[in-house]
Amino acid sequence: MFKVDNSDLRRWTGDVTRGLRDLRAPLTAAGNVIEAKVAEQFQREVDPDGDAWEPLSPDTLKNKEGGSILVKTGALRDSFEYEVDGDTLTVSSSSPVFEAHDQGIPPIPQRQILGLNAEDKNQIAGIVKGYVRGSKGRRR
């Protein structure tokens, strides 16, 4: 799990966000971006930086009936959700095996799922900046 909170937004967009009271719209848009990114990572079998996940071991391949890395039933892939609460966006997984795979707990190799690369951060900053520009005329 990770959070994008108001301190991150202020750093990304400067002091202009201080005048904003309701960040739900840009945080929801950012949550949608992250959700789509996670789905793409499962499809491409890559971490947030685009590096390939470690291949399955021969033992795992023997016991696995098709499917891709980290997808046996789809439960882990489909377990990600985000929540906007005030000025905080929380992205998490309800899967009990998420942390073992994301962090790598031996003998399971790390196959990072959640995280933001520089391009993701720029995209989210662009969403917030667009919202800030659109709100300037609405502030009191």
Give the residues covered by each predicted segment.
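Short, Lys/Arg-rich flexible segments
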Residues: 1-140
